[in-house]
Amino acid sequence: MFHWEKVGRGFLGAIGEYPVYAEQGNNVLRVRRGATPRPARETRALPRIVAEYFALDHPLAAICASFPDDPIMTAAQNFCGGLRIIRQPKWECLATFICSSMKQVAHIRQISRALRERFGVARSLLRVRPAVDNYVVHVFPSARRLANSSQNELRECGLGYRAKNLLATARLVSSGEADLEAWSALSDLDLQAKLCELPGVGAKVANCVMLFAYERLRAFPIDVWIERVLRQQYFPRARKLNSQRLRKFCESHFGEHGGYAQQYLFHYARTALRKSGGSKVSSTPLRSARNNKRNDGRMGGNKSISRSKRKNKSKSRSENGTTSAAQVVSAPGLR
């Protein structure tokens, strides 16, 4: 989700191995796809692929109706109308969030682009429209491709200490020791435990992957931004609030669609509240969230699946969001 770019009147990116140009108008999402090397393997029509990726089948009205009836959630819901939780490819999602530790969104985008351009396969979008003629999209590199790279090569993409973790996890996934697809059958608790066994994955990254790749909509990632909002809006007078208490509150308060609530709060805090200065909090250090991020990013790359008994210490937005699955249109001239 970090690689999509505004081009012309639409957005350019990749859905798995497919280069895609998407443009929305009048509640209709028009999508064009570039060439792929294995067209025979894909039997689904493009509208179905796009609708699945952007989760256009999620009952957004019902999900929003399940949000807590409190001022901050009401404001966030009104501000973020149409925001959806996308369904990302599992390996791409996991690798990207391993790279995200202690990084701002702009830096994550830079890393994602560097990995794609250095290790990913280039796909061209031909005859889409003049604004994007001959535009090349690099798809995210496979686990096998990154497993055959080196730490130095990954560091040259801006990963720093994260290179060790990404390389180790890529090798586990590539070898089949970490079977990301098979993990879909696990319960939420077991899935989180499996993810946290991987190098570079702590509670926050695990929850991000559960939410965006495994569609576990109860997952509620807590980073510095979210903790800041939670403390200010729900615990303004609490001097001592550890991460365990905060997690339990989120589970009970936000419920079965906590992941959606988290995204609405996150986007609202980073845009409307930040611009108005309303998200300012006291100078009390946000130790629990920061420690979580350190755990996510600095876990040793020598961890393996066999160490499962060791305890872990611990937007994509469819424009307007009103497009339904039936309104996705495959534009003429698709390849």
Stretch-by-stretch model annotation:
Residues 1-298, 302-335:
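HhH-family (HhH-GPD) DNA N-glycosylase catalytic core used in base-excision repair
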